[in-house]
């Protein structure tokens, strides 16, 4: 997609994946997944979001065409040689709880979210669930955002608590599910 000569209103940084999902209602293989994919799709109903992520050269053209049809600015989408990030999981009946069966980071393992210049003045930033050091790397590239939202998960709470605390101190809103909130705070009565 061509980059307009203006700032992007919303920048979303996160994963772009091919997911294989099992639910009590059925299974799907290699469907579009990832925090950046879904957040950009949702934001596209209101604005033209800027996507920051990485995919391999095996990323389906149909998925990229979907991003085009939704008006998602892809100046921050890196397409590199290798395989796209893949995740496989199973959801319980209530769809609140999931179990990861397999994670293949592939090209996502070497992802460094370097923002195009047109994204750096964005007033609204969503930092998807990625390593908090990478979230901080993004924050260091943005000039005076109005509002920053970050997502995290149990993995980062355990393996990167100092970086996570540093990142949290720089955002306006943190998204956690109930089990992550318990894990992070150490409180079981929320």
What label would you give each PLM region?
Residues 143-147, 154-190:
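Conserved phosphate/ATP/ADP-binding segment of small-molecule kinases
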Residues 11, 126, 148-149, 175:
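Structural detector of well-ordered beta-strand residues that form the stable sheet scaffold
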Residues 34-44, 139:
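Histidine-anchored nucleotide/phosphate-binding helix
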Residues 4-9, 18-30, 45-127, 140-145:
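Conserved N-terminal subdomain of the carbohydrate kinase-like
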Residues 63, 134-141, 162-166:
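A short acidic, amphipathic alpha-helical/loop segment
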Residues 14-16:
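Active-site metal-binding loops of divalent metal-dependent hydrolases
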Residues 56-57, 129-134, 153-157:
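Short beta->alpha connector loops
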């Amino acid at each position: 997609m061509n980059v307009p000569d203006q700032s992007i209103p919303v920048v979303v940084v996160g994963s772009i994946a091919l997911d294989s999902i099992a639910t009590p209602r059925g299974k799907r293989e290699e469907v579009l997944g990832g925090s950046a994919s879904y957040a950009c799709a949702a934001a596209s109903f209101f604005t033209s979001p800027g996507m920051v992520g990485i995919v391999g050269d095996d990323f389906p053209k149909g998925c990229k065409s979907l991003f085009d049809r939704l008006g998602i600015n892809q100046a921050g989408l890196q397409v590199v040689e290798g395989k796209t990030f893949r995740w496989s999981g199973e959801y319980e009946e209530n769809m609140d709880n999931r179990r990861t069966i397999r994670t293949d980071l592939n090209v996502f393992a070497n992802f460094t979210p370097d923002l195009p210049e047109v994204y750096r003045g964005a007033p609204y930033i969503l930092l998807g669930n990625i390593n908090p050091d990478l979230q901080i790397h993004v924050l260091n590239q943005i000039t005076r955002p109005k509002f920053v939202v970050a997502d995290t998960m149990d993995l980062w709470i355990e393996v990167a608590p100092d970086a996570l605390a540093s990142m949290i101190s720089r955002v306006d809103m943190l998204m956690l599910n109930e089990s992550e909130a318990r894990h992070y705070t150490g409180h079981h009565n929320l």
